[in-house]
Amino acid sequence: MSDNTVLAPPTSNQGPTTPRKGPPKFKQRQTRQFKSKPPKKGVKGFGDDIPGMEGLGTDITVICPWEAFSHLELHELAQFGII
């Protein structure tokens, strides 16, 4: 055997033959879909059952959201974007 024989892979000036792909791209959803329904509001108005408030009616809207959703916890309100 001769000592001049070198076993080496053929050298090439080019890169790999398959193009390299970057990380996968994910599409952002435009709207958020909740699997459960948002909570229902509690009592909205005072009503005629409070003495001295008879003329106000029952469609008085609550200004503060925590009054309308007083039966829920804060994490439940945040889950549905109420607060």
UniProtKB/Swiss-Prot annotation:
Region Disordered, residue ranges: 1-51
Subunit structure: Tetramer composed of two catalytic chains (alpha and beta), and two inhibitory chains (gamma).
Name of the featured protein: Retinal cone rhodopsin-sensitive cGMP 3',5'-cyclic phosphodiesterase subunit gamma
Organism, scientific name: Bos taurus (Bovine)
Keywords carried by this UniProt record: cGMP, Hydrolase, Sensory transduction, Vision
UniProt KW Hydrolase keyword: yes
Signal sequence annotation: none
Gene Ontology CC: one annotated term: photoreceptor outer segment membrane
Entry keyword annotation includes Ligase: no
Biased segments, Polar residues type: 1-17
GO annotation terms (biological process): positive regulation of epidermal growth factor receptor signaling pathway; positive regulation of G protein-coupled receptor signaling pathway; positive regulation of MAPK cascade; visual perception
Any Pfam family hit: PDE6_gamma
